[in-house]
From Swiss-Prot:
Source organism, top-level taxon: Bacteria
Organism in which the protein naturally occurs: Klebsiella pneumoniae subsp. pneumoniae (strain HS11286)
Residues in compartment: Cytoplasmic: 1-24, 94-160, 209-219
NCBIfam families: PRK10847.1 (NF008102)
Function: Could be involved in undecaprenyl phosphate (UndP) transport and recycling. Involved in biosynthesis of LPS lipid A. Plays a role in virulence, probably by allowing bacteria to resist the host immune response. Plays a role in stress response to nitric oxide. Involved in maintenance of membrane potential.
UniProt keywords, alphabetically: Cell inner membrane, Cell membrane, Membrane, Transmembrane, Transmembrane helix, Virulence
InterPro entries linked to this entry: DedA-like, VTT_dom
Membrane topology note: Multi-pass membrane protein
PANTHER family registered for this protein in UniProt: INNER MEMBRANE PROTEIN DEDA-RELATED, TRANSMEMBRANE PROTEIN
Name of the protein described by the UniProt record: DedA family protein
Cell compartments where the protein resides: Cell inner membrane; Membrane
Residues that span the membrane, as ranges: 25-45, 73-93, 161-181, 188-208
Topology, Extracellular side: 46-72, 182-187
Phenotype seen when the gene is deleted: Normal growth rate in strain ST258/RH201207. Increases susceptibility of strain ST258/RH201207 to the polymyxin antibiotic, colistin. Results in production of LPS lipid A that lacks aminoarabinose (Ara4N) in strain ST258/RH201207. Significantly reduces virulence of strain MKP220 in a mouse Swiss Webster strain lung infection model. Bacterial burden of strain MKP220 increases in a neutropenic mouse Swiss Webster strain lung infection model, by comparison with untreated mice. Increases sensitivity of strain MKP220 to nitrosative stress.
Length: 219
């Protein structure tokens, strides 16, 4: 429970925690951000990490004159982390996907996560790799499912690069451009919650549609 409470606190107060990391570790924060983003996109056991809000807050902090963070270097490193993470995830799914999800009682490798991602694939096809970047949990499992389904790596790699660029550039530069505005600084926590809700909403809608479609077929 302590870990769960820590994760919830980290996500909801990511602006405070990230500022503390910058103050404590200086330039090493680039490596920390790289590792967090790589884990969220590259490891199916960490779909809960806050990629969207992390990118936005990192961009916002780099806009403040009190920090020495270079937003352009950060964007470059985050794009690389996202691309490499998805590539690793694809490889894991291709080699070990069926074995990892063979246990229906697993608390980590839940079939519901796969079902959620499959519904995205049914609707959007290969473009899921791009669109999933903007949907928490789905973005972690999309490359994994692509690997399980033996999607052509050439096609996957193209979608992977495009998706990583769009995702990282949008959220990081949005934070950089608007993060130092007084109205944003004063309501940053509410904005973080809004980003999380808006990110999760498409996935929730997709699940509802999928369940309704399954119910109609059952009838």
């Amino acid at each position: 429970m302590d870990l769960i409470h820590f994760l919830i606190d980290f996500i909801l107060h990511i602006d405070v925690h990230l500022a503390e990391l910058v103050a404590q570790y200086g330039v090493w924060v680039y490596a920390i951000l790289f590792l967090i983003l790589f884990c969220e996109t590259g490891l199916v056991v960490t779909p809960f990490l806050p990629g969207d809000s992390l990118l936005f807050v990192a961009g916002a902090l780099s806009a403040l004159p009190t920090n020495d963070l270079n937003v352009h270097l950060m964007v470059l490193l985050m794009v690389i982390a996202a691309i490499v993470g998805d590539a690793v995830n694809y490889t894991i799914g291709r080699l070990f996907g069926e074995k990892l999800f063979s246990n229906p009682n697993s608390k980590i490798f839940r079939r519901s996560y796969l079902d959620k991602t499959h519904s995205f694939y049914e609707r959007h096809g290969g473009k899921t790799i791009i669109l999933a970047r903007f949907v928490p949990i789905v973005r972690t499992f999309a490359p994994f499912v692509a690997g399980m389904g033996h999607m052509s790596y050439r096609h996957f790699a193209a979608y992977n690069v495009v998706g990583a660029l769009l995702w990282v550039l949008l959220f990081t530069y949005a934070g950089y451009l608007f993060g130092d505005l007084p109205v944003v600084q004063e309501n940053l926590k509410l904005l973080i919650v809004a980003i999380i809700v808006l990110s999760v909403l498409p996935g929730v809608i997709e699940i509802i549609r999928h369940k309704r479609a399954a119910a109609k077929q059952a009838k």
